[in-house]
């Protein structure tokens, strides 16, 4: 039997007394009064901040949104199925923040920036607030660099610049996501980090986009943030801010970023659901009064930063879905007024076989030619004018039976120019290819080609120039201008290819 010496006991007690730390910890704790539908009402959180993160007993995280006189209304970032009336809630003293870093590139994450692609954890050490203030006036400079989408109709007539916010708007199934994903594919080799935010979409649709990006090697510079249709409204509401925060990390490091929010109608619906459950007074179309601020504070974070801040940029392409082409509904008008222009996709044009179904007449870019390279400016001006005149004449020609020769010629050219704007999905064109394509159309080289052969002719011509007259593309690519030398070579190439094409067609 071991004998314990009294001195040993006393030394152990003395040591314990010396190590005793009389630290007082103050924790702000409340009690759940009511819970359900992703909303909790809590009593007793006296010193909670608006937007502060709360921790429930089962580990679920919530955000305090409604601070009322006798209770706090919080939304939960999870199911919260085990939370009961009377269970305790702890205020964390933190505002919502997410980890950020280079390691996120090529990954698929949720609104809390946690990986959902099964490729393991993402190593990061930096954090950024989910709701950061937008850069001020002095922190910005005007948009002057082009962001090429690879789509002729957009790059020629509705150009987008780095740091711009351009809305993509249209009915369901008109190719809005296709325009956005084509823009991502076209950023390959341009040193642009792309963030694709999928809000409230079918998991199958998101998987399809991710597969397309992986197949084309675009995931190497892309981050996908996804909250599917079955996700809690809180997470669908937060997803766009997560995308903006991840892009901001790169923007403030002097990099160029492109963020696509697909789509903000779903985010507004999720926010409406949260607000109505929190018993906030409904406004127009039952949306809460601050739904404009919901989108403005998100889109104002897109900017072209000043030289002092490293000249980084964040370009935002928000997507909004309309019902039966009604652009005067609440959310579409809100987002149109916040953005620097809109690309309107028409269901009628889509069904008529014009894809991408861009309605050039009511689409606009408020940055304009400042976001175009000189070569594109040289050829694009005439294209827009010819198409506008064609649209007017086409409407008139439906009523007139006998048209003069000049009008018939103009209509014939207009039909060929419209063919020129058609493009297959996931087949973006480089600037030099676009310039040569538009030049061919506006200078009458397509007038003798049958309308149904125009696309085949142009595809063959682009390949022929790349193979036999590569200097044309090289001049435009390096000088960014369409010089007389390039023009002479291009004329020669078109005439030579046209002879061969006519011979094979015959």
Curated annotation (Swiss-Prot):
The record marks 363 as: Required for activity. GO terms for cellular component: chloroplast thylakoid membrane; proton-transporting ATP synthase complex. It comes from the Eukaryota. It is an enzyme of class 7 (translocase). SUPFAM superfamilies: C-terminal domain of alpha and beta subunits of F1 ATP synthase, N-terminal domain of alpha and beta subunits of F1 ATP synthase, P-loop containing nucleoside triphosphate hydrolases. It is found in: Plastid, Chloroplast thylakoid membrane. Keywords: ATP synthesis, ATP-binding, CF(1), Chloroplast, Hydrogen ion transport, Ion transport, Membrane, Nucleotide-binding, Plastid, Thylakoid, Translocase, Transport. It catalyses: ATP + H2O + 4 H(+)(in) = ADP + phosphate + 5 H(+)(out). It is a peripheral membrane protein. CDD domains: ATP-synt_F1_alpha_C, ATP-synt_F1_alpha_N, F1-ATPase_alpha_CD. GO terms for molecular function: ADP binding; ATP binding; proton-transporting ATP synthase activity, rotational mechanism. Belongs to the ATPase alpha/beta chains family. Produces ATP from ADP in the presence of a proton gradient across the membrane. The alpha chain is a regulatory subunit. PANTHER family: ATP SYNTHASE SUBUNIT ALPHA, MITOCHONDRIAL. This is ATP synthase subunit alpha, chloroplastic.
